[in-house]
From Swiss-Prot:
InterPro entries per the UniProt record, alphabetical: Chalcone/stilbene_synt_C, Chalcone/stilbene_synt_N, Chalcone/stilbene_synthase_AS, Polyketide_synthase_type-III, Thiolase-like
One family name in Pfam for this protein: Chal_sti_synt_C
Enzyme class, first EC level, given as a word: transferase
Name of the protein this chain belongs to: Polyketide synthase 3
Length: 385
């Protein structure tokens, strides 16, 4: 049966990203948020929110939901109003559309006919429906009706690592497979007005943005037709951190997606991440975490700061994660793929020798509900100038 499997590791062959056109400037967002939610009388809470926004290190975010949508659906701004139907009616349409935009960019970079796509993986925590966003995205792209689809709902911020893990397994165990993996989240699922009793909501309103990212994954790239690897996916792993139950979560309720985020998350991640690294890199003989490149989900500034401090990382190791956080906020599952895209583009622009900032080996981390950690050991490829 070995002839049915590919030889060699799977690689990322193309990356595409997409965001809604509507832009939220972080400095202006506290005034905007309290105005559109008719909460300007809550002056003390607004000042708390302004401090959260100021500390976020976010410059701007993209957001599908605009004032016109709020005028059409005025109940969305109320804190506990039953608005799930209105949110889902928007998101079951918009999530596949934004995902399709990212896919189209990845397919264009790949340069091959879309008829060569054999598998489609889609993940989103924004909506749930049957048939799912995978079905609608495939239809929008005009993919073959025989494309093998996988739909994963409610993974959250670690989902970017999950789609790479599954795409790698599919590509390596099905010779000739080309897997289109998509992450898309639109935060209209959790937008609502403020409450003095719900400070976790304010954190979510301050950091989350909308985005989609797509990658094409395959083994044995066919260079004769122009396929070029960007990163090799060497190994993968997933773990639930000890004593972390209830620290990150989301719950679908009549008011939409209710978000949980405990203040101990940065500490939990920083205290446990080295164990994940040791398990991943001991077989390769690497123990210097400054000798690898980092593709890290920037869940928030505090997570990056704590990990950097704990592992004594050089300040440039999270430059791509910090850039994506600044320009887009936390886009849930797609964010880490934005970081991957930023890394390979910056490496080229700065004349680095590899797609991994001049380093051969690297790691991709996603953190999310559970508290779950996804990690992928990644190998860069030389850049030919």
């Amino acid at each position: 049966m070995n002839h049915l499997r590919a030889e060699g590791p799977a690689s990322v062959l193309a990356i595409g990203t997409a965001n809604p056109e509507n832009i939220l400037i972080q400095d202006e967002f506290p005034d905007y948020y309290f105005r559109v939610t008719k909460s300007e009388h809550m002056t003390q809470l607004k000042e708390k929110f302004r401090k959260i926004c100021d500390k976020s290190m976010i410059r701007k975010r993209n957001c599908f939901l605009n004032e016109e949508h709020l005028k059409q659906n005025p109940r969305l701004v109320e804190h506990e109003m039953q608005t799930l139907d209105a949110r889902q009616d928007m998101l079951v349409v918009e999530v596949p559309k934004l995902g399709k935009d990212a896919c189209a960019k990845a397919i264009k970079e790949w340069g091959q006919p879309k008829s060569k796509i054999t598998h489609l993986i889609f993940t989103s925590a924004s909506t749930t429906d049957m048939p799912g966003a995978d079905y609608h995205c495939a239809k929008l792209l005009g993919l073959s009706p025989s494309v093998k689809r996988v739909m994963m709902y409610q993974l959250g911020c670690y989902g970017g690592g999950t789609v790479l893990r599954i795409a790698k397994d599919i590509a390596e165990n099905n010779k000739g497979a080309r897997v289109l993996a998509v992450c898309c989240d639109i935060m209209a699922c959790l937008f609502r007005g403020p409450s003095d009793s719900d400070l976790e909501l304010l954190v979510g309103q301050a950091i989350f943005g909308d985005g989609a990212a797509a990658v094409i994954v395959g083994a044995e790239p066919d260079e004769s037709v122009g396929e070029r690897p960007i990163f090799e996916l060497v190994s993968t792993g997933q773990t639930i951190l000890p004593n972390s139950e209830g620290t990150i979560g989301g719950h679908i309720r009549e008011a939409g997606l209710i978000f949980d985020l405990h203040k101990d998350v940065p500490m939990l991640i920083s205290n446990n991440i080295e164990k994940c690294l040791i398990e991943a890199f001991t077989p390769i003989g690497i123990s210097d975490w400054n000798s690898i490149f980092w593709i890290t989900h920037p869940g928030g500034k505090a997570i990056l700061d704590k990990v950097e401090e704990k592992l004594h990382l050089k300040s440039d190791k999270f430059v791509d994660s910090r850039h994506v956080l600044s320009e887009h906020g936390n886009m849930s599952s797609s964010t880490v793929l934005f970081v991957m895209d930023e890394l390979r583009k910056r490496s080229l622009e700065e004349g680095k020798s590899t797609t991994g900032d001049g380093f051969e080996w690297g790691v991709l981390f996603g953190f999310g509900p559970g508290l779950t950690v996804e990690r992928v050991v990644v190998r860069s490829v030389p850049i030919k100038y």
